């Protein structure tokens, strides 16, 4: 079409249930809607409810979930031993990769040598990584830009600068 370089911000017909349908389209930059800021809430001055609804929309849009926990092992033998322990105790089959061994449905990643983080890392998945980065930056979170990986012009992985309790944290696109 004639407007292939434009990005849009729909506001009509958007609600909490279809928000992600809109945002999944790459031509949509943002969404708005009266479901977050209803006229009666404004008239009542119910700013707490407006704030709650808006935060709920942002939380749903970002959809943060734990994707996996990474554990730093000293070496490949220790990593394999740990993976076999998860398999024996919990039935989590292990899959050996080049730099790590995954257990279960990739919920646990055991590094074959110490990696990022004092103890390891935590991968947090999000529905929309570039929006998550922008949101967290506004909240004062710093990112290690040297860790950013991209595919087709979109970020697929990035580490936060600071560890949390000895764990590096990285965001990944779901």
Q: What positions do the PLM features span?
A:
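Catalytic cores of alpha/beta
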Residues: 1-4, 14-29
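Hydrophobic faces of well-ordered beta-strands that scaffold small-molecule active sites
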Residues: 6-12, 29-33, 69, 122
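Well-formed, non-transmembrane alpha-helical positions, independent of function
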Residues: 21-22, 56, 135
């Amino acid at each position: 079409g004639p407007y292939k370089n434009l990005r849009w911000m729909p506001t009509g017909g958007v609600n909490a249930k279809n928000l992600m349908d809109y945002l999944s389209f790459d031509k949509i930059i943002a969404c708005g809607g009266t479901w977050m800021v209803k006229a009666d809430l404004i008239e009542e001055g119910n700013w707490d409810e407006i704030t709650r609804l808006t935060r709920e929309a942002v939380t749903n849009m970002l959809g943060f979930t734990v994707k996996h926990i990474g554990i730093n092992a000293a070496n490949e033998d220790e990593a394999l031993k740990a993976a076999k322990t998860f398999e024996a105790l919990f039935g989590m089959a292990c899959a050996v990769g080049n730099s790590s061994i995954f257990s279960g449905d990739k919920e646990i990643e055991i590094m074959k040598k110490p990696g990022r983080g004092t103890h390891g890392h935590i991968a947090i998945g999000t529905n929309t990584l570039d929006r998550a980065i922008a949101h967290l930056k506004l909240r004062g979170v710093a990112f290690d830009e040297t860790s950013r990986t991209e595919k087709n012009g979109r970020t697929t992985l990035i580490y936060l600068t600071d560890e949390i309790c000895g764990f590096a944290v990285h965001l990944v696109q779901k």
